[in-house]
Amino acid sequence: MKKTGILNSHLAKLADDLGHTDRVCIGDLGLPVPNGIPKIDLSLTSGIPSFQEVLDIYLENILVEKVILAEEIKEANPDQLSRLLAKLDNSVSIEYVSHNHLKQMTQDVKAVIRTGENTPYSNIILQSGVII
């Protein structure tokens, strides 16, 4: 049995299979998942697990070169945004798009990870970097 890192087998496989520029979305309870895109549903109840908890684990285990966020998070959820930005390396590029555009972009991710997060615009697309 694995004792460190990502223990959820679906999340671990997703992280292990990422190549350079592959994208994964971590979303809140309300984010729709396009047909044909795998959904890894971690939600247990409203708020559990939180967006930040899931983001922390992923950032510990994958190299991220870019993140994509909804522009609306700046006004609708500034606390979530400031906590999120504090976790990113200075080398990580940050792109803001409209929430509708972010939802369209989920059509090109490897998977959407659904959290129990119940605050607005708590969605992020992580673009994988490369270690060489």
Swiss-Prot record:
UniProt: substrate binding residues: 28, 99, 121-123
Entry annotated with the keyword tRNA-binding: no
Enzyme class: isomerase
Reaction(s) the record says it catalyses: beta-D-ribopyranose = beta-D-ribofuranose
Subcellular location: Cytoplasm
Keyword annotations of the record: Carbohydrate metabolism, Cytoplasm, Isomerase
A GO molecular function held by the record: monosaccharide binding
InterPro entries: D-ribose_pyranase, RbsD-like_sf, RbsD_FucU
Entry GO CC: cytosol
Active-site residues, record numbering mapped to chain: 20
Keyword match Isomerase: yes
EC numbers: 5.4.99.62
GO term, biological process aspect, one: D-ribose catabolic process
Pathway: Carbohydrate metabolism; D-ribose degradation; D-ribose 5-phosphate from beta-D-ribopyranose: step 1/2
Signal peptide coordinates: none
Function statement: Catalyzes the interconversion of beta-pyran and beta-furan forms of D-ribose.
Family from the record: Belongs to the RbsD / FucU family. RbsD subfamily.
Binding partners and assembly: Homodecamer.
HAMAP family per UniProt: D_rib_pyranase
Official protein name in the record: D-ribose pyranase
Source organism of this protein record: Streptococcus agalactiae serotype V (strain ATCC BAA-611 / 2603 V/R)
Lineage: Bacteria, Bacillati, Bacillota, Bacilli, Lactobacillales
Gene transcribed to yield this protein: rbsD
